[in-house]
Design a protein with these regions (language model features):
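Conserved N-terminal/central alpha/beta ligand/cofactor-binding core
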Residues: 3-6, 29, 35-36, 40-122, ...
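Beta1/beta-strand and adjacent pyrophosphate-binding region of the FAD-binding site
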Residues: 6-20
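Core beta-strand elements of the Rossmann-like FAD/NAD(P) dinucleotide-binding domain
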Residues: 10-12, 133-143
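Short hydrophobic core segments
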Residues: 17, 139-148
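N-terminal Rossmann-fold NAD(P) dinucleotide-binding loop
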Residues: 23
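Mature extracytoplasmic enzyme cores
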Residues: 106, 140-144, 157
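Conserved beta-strand-loop-beta-strand element in the redox core of flavoprotein oxidoreductases
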Residues: 117-138
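Glycine-rich loop(s) and the adjacent beta-strand/alpha-helix scaffold that form part
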Residues: 146-189
Length: 189
């Protein structure tokens, strides 16, 4: 980290890296339980693959008599009411409001996590570079949630992690491949 550049320091209970739906739900759920949260996201809009940038609508597990509930259902109902034509700019606004209306969330958009500070084997701080302000954001927290989609905290911290698919017999998953491989982006089969 270049110390000649501006840095903004945050001290929170939970740092969530990644503002896709998983990161948003983690941040909102924690904030609603009184936890002080910093949400670092590397894009200008929330939602990850479900944002206007990628445009993968939220489908989830649902059928005739069942569907996703909780914060995802809250988003779905708000969208049904305010965005019946499913326009992505409105969708982005609904997601933006969800985060910004939570008083316990400090949102940090356009900020890519690129370094961490460890205390022994525990992450102490996450450091991100915000392109829009040309400054670093340093977030100290007790807990960290890696919802980045690319699992950036694991390699930065030296944690053990898997790349690819597990073999069929590792977890007794009948549709998994016979041998583990390095394929990504999809289901086990």
């Amino acid at each position: 980290m270049n110390t000649n550049l501006k840095s903004i320091y945050h001290k929170v209970d939970l740092c969530v890296v990644g503002g896709g739906l998983a990161g948003m739900c983690a941040a909102v759920a924690a904030a609603r339980h009184g936890i002080k949260v910093a949400l670092m996201h590397d894009r200008p809009v929330y939602g990850g693959n479900a944002s206007s940038e990628i445009r993968m609508w939220v489908c989830g597990a649902h059928g005739e008599n069942n569907r996703e509930t909780g914060i995802i259902e809250e988003i779905a109902l708000e969208t049904l009411y305010r965005n019946p034509y499913r326009r992505y700019p409105m969708w982005d606004a609904i997601l933006f409001e969800l985060i910004n209306n939570e008083k316990n969330i400090t949102p940090i958009l356009n900020c890519s996590c690129n370094d961490i500070e460890m205390d022994g084997s525990k992450i102490k701080k996450v450091i991100g570079w915000q392109t829009t302000t040309q400054c670093y954001h340093i977030i100290e927290a007790q807990l960290f949630a890696d919802c980045s989609g690319d699992s950036i905290l694991a390699p930065l911290s030296g944690a053990e992690y898997r790349w690819g698919r597990e073999s069929r017999n590792e977890f007794g998953e009948s549709i998994a491949p016979e041998q583990a491989d390095k394929k990504t982006m999809g289901l086990s089969c």
